[in-house]
Amino acid sequence: MDKSRIALGLLSFAVLGAILGYVLASAFLTFRWFGVGADIDFLMLARGYIDLRITRPADMRIVHLIVGICTSAGVLLSAVLMNDALTKFGETHWQTLSEMKRNGFLGEAGHGFILGKMGKPKGGKPLIMSKVFPHALIVAPTGRGKTTGFVIPNLLTYRGSAVVLDVKGENFEATSRHRAAQGDKVFRCAPTDWKDGRSHRYNPLLRIAGLENIDRQQMELQLLATLFLQADSDRVQGLLDGGIDLFVAAGLLAFERKRPTLGEIYRITASGGDKQKEYRRRADEVQNPAAKLIFMRMASTNNDTLTSYLSLLMTSGLKQWSNPAIDRATVTSDFDFAEIRKTPLSVYLVVEPLMVKPMAPLIRLFFSDLLATLQDHEPGDDEPWPVMIMLDEFNRLGKMPIVTDSIETLRSYRANLAIVTQTIPALDEIYGENARRALQGNAGIKLYLTPSDEKTIEELSKAVGKTTKRVVTRSRSVGRNPFAGRSMSERTEETALLPEDEVRRMDLDDIVLVVDAQMPVRAKRIKYYEDRFFKEIFDKQSGELPYPSTKDQMRGLQGQIQALEQKIGAMQVSSGKKEKPARRSEMDALTAEGAGAEPQRVPTIEAYQDASARVDRFLEGAAVE
């Protein structure tokens, strides 16, 4: 029991005892002086207390004794009652409005995540915001309204840059015009927009290719590969490591060719029939000593092992770049994550629901590069904007170690991370229970929308906490006298504040917030299309959606055409003439030692002419639109 409540109880019983003592003392004096039948004057003692102490000291000693005994009896009674109290177990309770205000959950929208509302959407109750905790884990099964109740409301209000995985593209359609009107530069990356092909481009290798230190380039390529290339089983991790070595060597060769793209890495690793001969030629071509050594090692590896390396490299994520659309979407970058804290950017990575799993390597690469860029340095004075990152369908993206590792430190880099998953078991399957618990703990706030699977129901009930329930048992013995033998017993028992049965029956509009080091919160989810605050923001949007312009698409396609024409022209020149590639100062000394390299092996002229014709047709279609 709270110490302040104990003190208040003791004081209350002491005052009651003193009042009773005063009444008895007044009656004693009246009956002693005026007889038993006299009317009691309760003010007599108060009026003449000082004089009576002088004139009637013996009587006043009795008065003091009566008042003292009654006061002591009151204190003793309070102690007895408190000792007689039933055992208390947990004391968890739902946060009150005053507690939430004190804990920083009520305030102006735009700073931190908006989590829910204290009342129905159409009502005037306050919104619940997370200012103290920068990250959130949202557990929401399909159809629970995580998009309308969490993602869209935050995109409509967040003041800063935003990067969101937009499954189905509805977030772009609902919020991009508002964010553009607020001054954000809006980008829509949609590699699988088969219908219109309207997509901005993003190339994660440009950041690495721009590094001056070639040793750091190698390390960054290896880190990048481990972030997005994943095997289905840990038993083949050794083979995947060999594939990653091949990826790194191909990346360094692509940098030397001045074509730093994942598509080029795919072509380097996959081209050629006899892989041993092919990689021997690549070893002769590349000037980087580390890449040369890797290619030579691959050339001396037996064919079965080499095939396993390459096969696992492709199935782990690189094969997606065999698709021309994916290759085009990553050939260059229309935006730079290094600028995301300097000027507000809104980047929507749009993927159709059925494409989330096949596109998981690109999605992992996209967000891993974002997190790595943010953590390159702490924000300076010229980087005032925070960054909101929303990872929807997190359980379908495969393992992202950089998320579990960086969520502990992202706060100091001015980033707010929201992870959305459907169930707890889905996370356990990928990360394991211990890593999942660490992820939950570092999130600070866990937002649950009516769970459906048993593991999540059990997890939520336990996470909310325990409370104490008073149980009264009545019994009677059967006999002739129905009023005889009756008894009543009272006890307390520990129970969940939110029992599992109640979790199963939660209203679909209810949400539960589990907060680190605080009492839980029960509230209502937001419906932006019904809430007056959000509906007003949404309805103010006007104009066309900020899709990539035809001019932007034509500029990118023209660049590809020029590159194709240059390759075709180069193939028509005598193969004996070879231009020395430009190299950094670190490589100049190594160039002389690498003499005797054979001409670069490239695809046929017909293949490039066919590709150029396809690009021309696409360009003509874009120009007509």
Regions found by a protein language model. Name each.
Residues 118-119, 525-529:
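Short beta-strand-to-coil "C-cap" segments at the C-terminal boundary of structured domains/repeats
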Residues 117-123, 330-331, 429-430:
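Short gly/ser/thr-rich secondary-structure transition/capping motifs
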Residues 1-144, 148-151, 204, 466, ...:
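Basic- and hydrophobic-enriched, low-structure N-terminal and domain-boundary segments
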Residues 353, 393, 421, 450-453, ...:
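Short loop or secondary-structure boundary microenvironments that flank
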